[in-house]
């Protein structure tokens, strides 16, 4: 079976923000999820979210993101993924993570994931490591989105933006996740202290029940002083 690919844009050095702004979500995934009731809060006209291509699913023609772009991009693993970002994160030049009412505004990044049986552990049950990878990837998309906008507002555009890496990911599994099936992954920024980024995430079933929760620490590289 051939691996599906998102539409490519003509750039040898495509960036994360290029993908968010210029690569539309795959029509097949939009059509698939639009038929499911769980997607309506994110796809309706009044939604605070914008559908995006998950950057790690985009084929960059190099060795980056091979796990999500190739290995887990098959009919038996993750046949469909549709990502969403809070519109404010893309559009605001004065972002703040302080005093945000998460009950009111919701998560920063949402992933709708169609799980195939290729990621199973027990029979008809998604492997915990697969769920951990989805949590980590959603958290990564969250921090990268924030970091790009904050970097643009805090420093000269010519300054190099440091990379950030997972330093700690603590997951609590509450219930098995049936597979094949549909899950919803939420991720949000809690706070930032210098190079440290504190985030939260959770996995919901199609019925809205929480299946897993995570807290994470990401750390940005030190910026070299010239």
Where are these regions (language model features)?
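A structural-propensity feature for long, helix-poor, extended segments
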Residues: 179-186
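Terminal targeting signals and extreme-terminal segments of soluble enzymes
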Residues: 1-179, 192-226
């Amino acid at each position: 079976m051939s691996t599906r690919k998102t539409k490519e844009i003509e750039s040898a050095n495509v960036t994360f923000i290029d993908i968010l702004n210029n690569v539309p979500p795959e029509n097949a995934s939009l059509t698939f999820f639009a038929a499911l009731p769980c997607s309506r809060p994110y796809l309706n006209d009044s939604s605070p979210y914008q559908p995006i291509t998950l950057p790690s699913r985009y084929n960059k023609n190099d060795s980056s993101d091979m796990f999500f772009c190739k290995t887990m991009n098959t009919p038996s693993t993750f046949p469909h993924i549709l990502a969403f970002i809070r519109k404010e994160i893309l559009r605001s030049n004065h972002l703040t993570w302080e005093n945000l009412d998460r009950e009111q505004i919701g998560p920063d990044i949402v992933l709708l994931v169609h799980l195939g049986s290729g990621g199973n552990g027990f029979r008809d049950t998604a492997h915990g490591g697969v769920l951990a990878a989805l949590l980590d990837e959603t958290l990564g998309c969250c921090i990268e989105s924030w970091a790009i906008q904050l970097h643009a507002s805090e420093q000269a555009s010519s300054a190099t933006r440091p990379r950030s890496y997972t330093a700690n990911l603590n997951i609590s599994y509450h219930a098995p996740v049936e597979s094949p099936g549909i899950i919803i992954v939420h991720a949000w920024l809690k706070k930032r202290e210098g190079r440290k980024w504190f985030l939260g995430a959770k996995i919901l079933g199609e019925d809205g029940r929480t299946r897993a929760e995570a807290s994470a620490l990401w750390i940005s590289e030190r910026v070299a002083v010239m």
